[in-house]
Regions:
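Helix-turn-helix
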Residues: 1-25
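Residues in soluble alpha-helical coiled-coils and helical-bundle/repeat scaffolds
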Residues: 13-17, 21, 38-42, 84, ...
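Hydrophobic/aromatic residues within well-ordered alpha-helical segments
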Residues: 15, 22, 26-30, 51-54, ...
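Hydrophobic alpha-helical connector segments
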Residues: 21, 35-70, 123-130, 152
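C-terminal peripheral helix-coil segments that are non-catalytic and often amphipathic
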Residues: 53-61, 102-114, 129-139, 143-165
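Amphipathic alpha-helical packing segments from all-alpha helical-bundle domains
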Residues: 71, 77, 86-114, 125-128
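Well-ordered alpha-helical segments within folded domains of soluble proteins
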Residues: 75-79, 134
Length: 165
């Protein structure tokens, strides 16, 4: 938030308000911004690029913290804690999650129409698989920093399985 400790105490009445603001600023708002930028003609490859953009923003935000072992498990724990404390934030995150799955579904259909990927696949299941790649605990095992390259690599691995040969 680019504030000193004294400034934080001035602007935020308690730790809960500060926590909620940090979650919104570093996790919710960037995701909302990239999802809102998606156009109707998005393809799977375009959606991968969009989600990579979000992950790059998240990576930059996490690099500003002193703790270099922040990983997927930590981020998910933070989100679950925030959801328990702030129901409105939880509803906002749920809407974003549903929107993301819908955008993946749209991207898959658009890619099928463009002849880029196979027909006859379970679009709903594949959309969920794409949406959950970034939540993978594998990218944060061993108390090491989140491996953002692994996430992008996984997106493309799934996409390559769907491509027409």
């Amino acid at each position: 938030l680019d504030m000193g400790r004294g400034t934080l105490y001035y602007y935020f009445k308690d730790q809960d308000e500060l926590f909620r603001t940090c979650v919104e600023t570093y996790i919710i708002e960037p995701k909302q911004k990239v999802l809102n930028s998606v156009t109707e003609d998005i393809t799977v490859e375009g959606m991968i690029q969009t989600m990579t953009q979000y992950l790059n923003h998240l990576k930059e935000a996490l690099m500003t913290f002193d703790n270099k072992s922040i990983n997927t498990g930590n981020v998910n724990s933070i989100m679950f804690t925030a959801y328990g404390r702030f129901p409105a934030l939880h509803r906002k995150a749920q809407r974003l999650a549903l929107k993301e799955v819908d955008l993946w579904r749209k991207a898959i259909y658009n890619s099928q129409r463009a002849g880029l990927i196979k027909h006859g696949i379970d679009v709903d299941q594949i959309a969920l698989m794409f949406a959950h790649i970034k939540n993978s605990y594998d990218s944060g095992l061993g108390r090491t920093q989140m491996n953002f390259q692994l996430l992008e690599k996984t997106y493309y691995a799934l996409y390559n399985l769907l491509k027409k040969k």
